[in-house]
Amino acid sequence: MIKRVHLGQGKAEEILDLPNLIEIQLNSYEKFLQLERLKTNRPLLNEGLESVFRDVFPMKSSNGEVALEYEKYYIEYNSLSFTEKECKRKGQSYEAVLKIRLNLQFLTTGEIRQKDVYMGTIPLMTDRGTFIVNGAERVIVSQIHRSPGVVFYKEKDLYYARIIPYRGSWLEFEIDSKKDYLYVKIDRKKRILVTLFLRALGLNTRERIIETFYKIRKIEVNEDTKREITGQYLATNIIIKENMTYRAGDKITLQDIEDFLQNGVKEIDLIDFDGYDSVPGKHFISSDVILNCFEKEDAYFSLKDGFKELSRESVMLAVYSVLLPGEPISIDNAESDLRNVFFSEKRYDLGHVGRYKLSKKFGLDDLTTSVLTMTDIVNTISHLLRIYDGHDVLDDIDHLGNRRVRSVGELLTNIYKGAMSRVEKIAKDRMSNKEVFNLKPQELISVKPIVSAVKEFFATSQLSQFMDQVNPLAELTHKRRLNALGPGGLSRDRAGFEVRDVHYTHYGRMCPIETPEGPNIGLIVSLATYAKVNDYGFLETPYRKVVDGKVTDEIEYLSAIDEEKKCIAQANAAVNAEGNYIDDLISVRVSGDYTTMIPKNIDYMDVSPRQLISVSSALIPFLEHNDANRALMGSNMQRQAVPLLFPQPPIVGTGMERIVAKDSGVVVKAKRSGIVVLATSKKIVIRPEDAADDHDLDEYELAKYERTNQDTSFNHSVLVKEGQVVNKGEIIADGPATRYGEVALGNNLLVGFIPWNGFNYEDAILISERIIKEDLYTSIHIKEFSIEVRETKLGPEKVTADIPNVSGKILNKLDENGIVRIGTYVKPGDILIGKVTPKSEGDITPEFKLLTSIFGEKAKDVKNNSLKVPHGTEGTVIDVQRITKDDVSNLPPGVDEILKVYIAKKRKLKEGDKMAGRHGNKGVVAKILPVEDMPYLADGTPLDICLNPLGVPSRMNIGQLMESQLGLAGKYLGEYYDVPVFESATNECIQEKLKKAGFNETSKAVLYDGYTGEPFENEVMVGIIYMLKLHHLVDDKMHARSTGPYSLVSQQPLGGKAQFGGQRLGEMEVWALEAYGAAHTLQELLTVKSDDMSGRVKIYENIVKGIPTNVSGIPESFNVLMQELRGLGFDLSIYDDKGNQIPLTEKEEELINKT
């Protein structure tokens, strides 16, 4: 194990240990399946799968005679046919059978029939947080989406309030600030006046609406108050005589006051616009928008002056025609339909998150009601009008209080909810249709919708992804990813800049650095190191509590909503041993503002400087000295580093390397403390301290050269010896890209920042041959090739070494069964599996028929259908798998067996491979120079790698220089360093280490030219830099074509390596050749090498026969042009120099021949 020296400015030990880095996956799935609770007691009723079944059951028949009740569910572990490893090898899914116990109750007789009903299979999560589906490891990525609840926002001149439920219709209110009207939209349909909507929901008079939204004051009517009353609005109706009525919401004129005085009206109720804030707990408004809506109503329904209230019929007609246009209407039905849209639990569900958000927004205590209430609607309208008047502020849609995370468990719960609603429908139909008393519970439940929904989700959902398994970091990051795309999320094209941007609430929750470059930037992000997801799905981050200016060790997790307006100090603020701040003014954050405060006003303090970034970014030393764009590239490229044969841990690390290796799941950890009894390359056996008897041993199977999803090699190497004592949780075997229990993605190289003969121009890299000879960047890549042996109409296909028309030389790599031998080195075109397929009669030539009729020979009527090594692949066969129906019961229909061949290739670093450091400093290897030609130090040590110094200043990633300097000191002092992010070693500290190692404090040295032995004119900065080899290998990209497939439509060669295609010769390339006057080159490129069908056959014939040739026919594209011109009415024909017509098509040829 490596001893690391802590060189950070802070303390070596953290206040709070990092949580398990894949707990977002494990916890969410445990919440869904509740496996631990199933073993001991009842699962929680409102969580996961249990809640799905509780929502659907009990089911009752329409006549009320039969009820189907749910008791419990359980997982049949004995139904697991294969282990995780076997599932991968045999292409199966790692899943178990789900059963539920149902009671069918006959309410008339009291009889109960109980049965455990099969509910399909359910994929199980491995302890690494992944699923194995059809033999491949997959990850369900967490989705970040708009939280249910209410949001207030503004677009152009419109103010909006939107109530978003978890399930059900969206309700949207909008104020048009130009016209001062308030409208409602249901599910983004046509808009309705808000007063009409409120009347439809039960506030059926003007008086009731005014009473709900406005403060009312009483005032005496007399000569003194005349002036005050004029122009005010009535709050209640006044009826003096039949022809003298005044409506609530009408404006009072001087004439009206005269009428009041004449008719003895002593006191009236007015709307008090100024008293909107005077009643605690009431959200009154000061806006006349609702009164304007009354006027608009009058115009809409053509109500003349005089006392008229809208009838219930006309209101319902207006609202229902928008809700369900074109439907026949009955008033009672319309009213119940409208109420069902928002107030029925069957059709509307705010979810506990939506209810929490609504109650939090309006200061209510209710956390249980799952539907909307009239109070919610009134509060929403009031709040929107208060915002419009400037008494309240708008919401920020991108605030993390308005976005929440849906992880595996919740996504699966939703899938099961959808499937179970279909199951319920079918069951209810069966209850009413069948002879009820002969029924059994299992006959009512149709399991098809569930099976297909779960299968579809795991196989095809946008959030179920093929795991990125290039290296342990890629694996870990994939499980911690947050995706804003996917079903119910954003779409790439419609997502604007604001959604993608970094928001102040991301601090400690989402990483501001790690995100893809390209169209997904900002939509796919990573969880910050300490972040957790709370019960409501909101992201939380931990803080240390500060009481009266004193920092305590009490840790509190805060969501973005809880953190609002809190005053938070940075983790590196100076604190003495008692927990008091040393400085008088402390730098703090308050809701996105950065300021200074006295210690007494501080509420919380960060737990660690690395809490705001993700795991990938936390692996970059001296991150704070890099430009953010380069840090983004650095964190993304570490995930593409190929696992090497001999990796080294970085000399300059950040302290995260061990944690990442431990939580990624690629290393082997001891389950219990004990003594190692056996340690071989394939197996470790430990006798635990608390062993019950001699047979109680812990066995660990190690993986040897297994293929990952990305064709890299997964290999364990043992770290313990027999007789060694190990502790629980200790790493006993390294995995890919780990060394001594730490992540090791690359190697430490001696670097010089110096241009060398133009070979490192434009980020190219010059490297020493020593790297190749010592296999420092050699990696193993394993490819899988498979072939199916089918049952055809003409008989079964056969795997055999007896293949027609194949020479013995080709067959000598196969064994007697026609399968390639393990250990054989194969090249493109070699046969891996010999397979013959019966030929149909149509395939047989007349000569062959004659031979068979003479000799009666039927043995040769088969055709060669063998599996061959494709172009660009070579290597050693390391394994062959045969999967037959005896191994796996569910082979695809018509398939007798599947054979898989694994070919491993050792790839050394070569020109054209991409390399990168951890600071976004990437480049392509341009030349591999002999060691003796490399520039060397005064003591004769040659450099390993030369980087261009021009790659540093404009990119502003100074971190690579500081890493190189400290690495140099570490190399010569034999030390490994921890340099934590945001509290890195200072320049003084680095210089001190360099002096101690005997170097100049700038780490600049005189370099000598390997060619001449002369020193270079200026001193050169040298150091030790950590470089990675990326998964962009030249061998995978190099490609050449001689002859290959052509497109059916255009008859031109296909493009791309996968299709074995050619290089496109575009119009600019044609211009270049025209400019050179290269007529013959141009002619063959545009005809026989492209789409001249007859010409290319002829030229091939001539080449085979050895005849010098210059064939040119008519290219297919010319024929297309001809036909297009003919379509426009031109009659075109072509003649040679003798005046004979040249046929363009076969039809023309026939016509010419006839004439």
UniProtKB/Swiss-Prot annotation:
Catalytic activity: RNA(n) + a ribonucleoside 5'-triphosphate = RNA(n+1) + diphosphate
Protein family: Belongs to the RNA polymerase beta chain family.
Taxonomic lineage of the native organism: Bacteria, Pseudomonadati, Spirochaetota, Spirochaetia, Spirochaetales
GO terms for biological process, alphabetical: DNA-templated transcription
PROSITE patterns xrefs: RNA_POL_BETA
One CC-aspect GO term: DNA-directed RNA polymerase complex
Top EC group: transferase
Entry protein name: DNA-directed RNA polymerase subunit beta
